[in-house]
A protein has these predicted regions:
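An exposed, glycine/acidic-rich loop-and-rim segment of catalytic or binding clefts
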Residues: 1-333
Length: 333
């Protein structure tokens, strides 16, 4: 494993290059993924420069989202309304990705563990309680890059000092091959159910994918599916898909674009998939891809956002923990 450290604007970037051909570039800021390359070809949609990556406050490219990822009505939690009250967007009355508390710009400590079968980078921090979120969290985000296979595992662990709502995920955007044609990618998700949303984009209930554009069990072109929701407030795909199997041994998410294939397996309940519906004018990317709708998709491992109280609450004896395995290949492999 070849490991390199570089600096930009006082921030550290760690590049791990596996003999398998997979390279993972990480940063302690947001315990995030700066870039993923396979045989030197970009697999992610990443800002053109390190400085752009560090200062982006819109898309959170590859960074950790927490303490609560997703949309929450008025920032309140059932049963804990008087204690936990996250910042709210005054225009919508909704909390998105914890707003100003978001971990995407928290600086984590890190250590590198080199082993025979691969290298692990562990980002960790004790994040103190505050008025809006009165719980202290011990957070650990780890990436394990295999020495022999083009794959890496992302693990999230968070232990609160009291009962608290927790929901951590990663906001990486996939653009396999770094081409404009990525919107032609085929997406397959082995999920029988998906989340429906209200006019404020808050999750309502689980519904069957049967007979809907969101039935991706056999695979469909991303653009074709996203265009079905273009006239809605979602603007495209922005849905939680409940996977049929929660296991690292059984991938449930498959993205194919050009010569490349990404398969993902997770212990989380669902994937939140977003088809880059609202590009920001002037955005530039390291791969040179054109800034346009549908050029990338996310695959955020998430919890059950329709039953927030039961699934979001964790404790010292019952910490938050998810694992997700990302594996890359070419069609020839």
């Amino acid at each position: 494993m070849k490991i390199q450290k570089t600096e930009c604007a006082g921030e550290t970037f760690l590049s791990l290059a596996s003999p398998s051909g997979l390279t993972l570039v990480l940063t302690p800021l947001g315990a995030g993924i700066r870039e993923v390359l396979y045989h030197g070809v970009p697999m992610t949609l990443s800002p053109a420069t390190d400085a752009d990556y560090l200062h982006d406050h819109v898309f959170f490219y590859g960074k950790t989202i927490g303490p609560i990822a997703g949309r929450i009505d008025r920032g309140r939690f059932p049963g804990l309304e008087s204690e936990f009250a996250l910042p709210v967007n005054p225009k919508t009355g909704v909390t998105l990705h914890s707003e100003s508390l978001d971990y995407a710009f928290h600086r984590f400590g890190f250590k590198i563990e080199e082993k025979e079968d691969g290298t692990r980078v562990v980002f960790s921090s004790v994040i103190p309680a505050c008025l809006e979120y009165p719980a202290t969290l011990e957070v650990e985000v780890s990436y394990f890059l295999s020495e022999t296979e083009p794959a890496f595992t992302l693990s999230y662990f968070a232990r609160p000092n009291r009962v608290a709502p927790i929901h951590l995920t990663n906001h990486v955007y996939w653009n396999l091959g770094g081409k404009d044609e990525a919107k032609e990618a085929t997406l397959q998700i082995l999920a029988d159910r998906v989340v429906s949303y209200d006019e404020r984009l808050l999750p309502k209930e689980k519904v069957s994918v049967e007979g809907s554009p969101l039935d991706l069990r056999e695979g469909k072109k991303v653009e074709d599916v996203a265009d079905c929701f273009d006239a809605t407030p979602l603007g495209g795909i922005d849905h939680g898909f409940y996977v049929n199997e929660r296991s690292l041994a059984h991938p449930t998410y498959f993205l194919t674009s050009g010569d490349f294939v990404l398969s993902i397996a997770t212990t989380a309940k669902a994937f939140q998939v977003y088809s880059y519906n609202f590009p920001v004018e002037g955005s530039r990317f390291s791969s040179g891809v054109t800034n346009a709708k549908r050029i990338a998709v996310t695959s955020e491992p998430v919890l059950d956002s329709t039953t927030m109280k039961e699934d979001f609450l964790f404790s010292p004896a019952h910490p938050f923990h998810t694992e997700t395995l990302f594996r890359f290949a070419t069609k020839k492999e």
